Amino acid sequence: GKCGEINGSCDECYGGSVTCDCY
């Protein structure tokens, strides 16, 4: 899943230089 996707996973949001909100 990508950042901001309600049904997405937070794997792409945490770990790395990217900060974003996962729902």
Swiss-Prot record:
Disulphide bridges, residue numbers: C10-C20
GO molecular function annotation: sodium channel regulator activity; toxin activity
Tissue specificity comment: Expressed by the venom gland.
UniProt keyword annotations, A-Z: Disulfide bond, Ion channel impairing toxin, Ionotropic glutamate receptor inhibitor, Knottin, Neurotoxin, Postsynaptic neurotoxin, Secreted, Toxin, Voltage-gated sodium channel impairing toxin
One GO CC annotation: host cell postsynaptic membrane
Main location: secreted
UniProt function note: Insecticidal neurotoxin that reversibly inhibits the N-methyl-D-aspartate (NMDA)-subtype of ionotropic glutamate receptor (GRIN) and inhibits inactivation of insect sodium channels (Nav). In vivo, is highly toxic to insects.
Protein name in the entry: U1-ctenitoxin-Co1a
Originating species: Ctenus ornatus (Brazilian spider)
